[in-house]
C-alpha cells in the first residue's frame, strides 16, 4: 500500500523464498513525517538461512529497524538508523571447528549511517550524472563487533543519441573490531 489512510504512508509486507533462505518483512515508510521533509521508517523482519548442506550451519535472525532519512544539503541525503536482532546459529557435524564455536544465541544492536550524494539529471531513465552512496553499520551491542562498510558509485553518460552507458563500482567489507572471526551471518557472500 503506497497511500495508507490517504497520508502518503507506504506499508509493505513481503515474503521471499529461495533455495537456502526464507525472509519475511513488514515495513512502514512515511516520506514526510509531520510535514518535516524527513522520512521515517520502521520494519520488522525474520530471516532463516539454511546452509547445512553446503557449509554445515543454519541461522535464524529476527529483529527490527527504525530510521530516518533527510536532505542535509542540496543533492546530499543523510540517513540514520538503529537495528536490533536476536539470532540463533546452529551447526551440524559437517561444520568446521571455527563454525561450531559460533553456535549459540546472539543479540546485536547496530547504528547505521547512510550518505547519498545524487547528481543524476533525473531519477528515472537517467542519462547523465552520477550517484555516490556510502553506508556503515557500527556495532553498539555485539559479541563479535562486526563493522560493515559499503560503497556504491554509478556514473551515467549518453555516448550516442538515445544510447545511455553506465559504469558502476560496488565495494563492501566486514571487519571484526575485536580481531575475532566474523559471525557467519555477517560475512559477505558473493
Task: Show where each model-derived region lies.
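Gram-negative/organellar outer-membrane beta-barrel architecture
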Residues: 1-133
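C-terminal outer-membrane beta-barrel translocator/porin domains of Gram-negative envelope proteins
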Residues: 1, 98-104, 108-190
Amino acid at each position: 500500500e503506497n497511500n495508507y489512510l490517504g497520508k502518503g504512508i507506504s506499508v509493505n509486507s513481503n515474503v521471499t523464498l529461495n533455495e537456502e533462505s526464507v525472509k519475511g518483512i513488514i515495513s512502514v515508510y512515511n516520506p514526510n513525517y509531520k510535514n518535516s521533509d524527513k522520512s521515517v521508517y520502521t520494519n520488522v523482519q525474520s530471516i532463516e538461512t539454511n546452509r547445512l548442506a553446503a557449509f554445515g550451519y543454519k541461522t535464524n535472525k529476527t529483529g527490527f529497524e527504525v530510521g530516518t532519512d533527510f536532505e542535509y544539503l542540496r543533492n546530499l541525503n543523510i540517513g540514520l538508523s538503529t537495528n536490533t536482532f536476536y539470532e540463533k546459529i546452529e551447526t551440524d557435524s559437517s561444520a568446521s571447528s571455527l563454525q561450531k564455536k559460533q553456535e549459540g544465541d546472539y543479540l546485536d544492536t547496530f547504528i547505521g549511517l547512510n550518505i547519498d550524494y545524487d547528481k543524476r539529471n533525473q531519477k528515472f531513465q537517467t542519462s547523465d550524472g552520477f550517484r555516490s552512496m556510502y553506508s556503515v553499520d557500527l556495532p553498539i551491542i555485539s559479541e563479535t563487533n562486526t563493522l560493515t562498510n559499503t560503497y556504491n558509485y554509478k556514473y551515467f553518460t549518453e555516448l550516442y543519441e538515445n544510447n545511455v552507458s553506465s559504469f558502476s563500482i560496488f565495494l563492501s567489507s566486514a571487519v571484526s573490531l575485536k580481531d575475532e572471526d566474523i559471525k557467519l551471518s555477517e560475512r559477505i557472500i558473493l
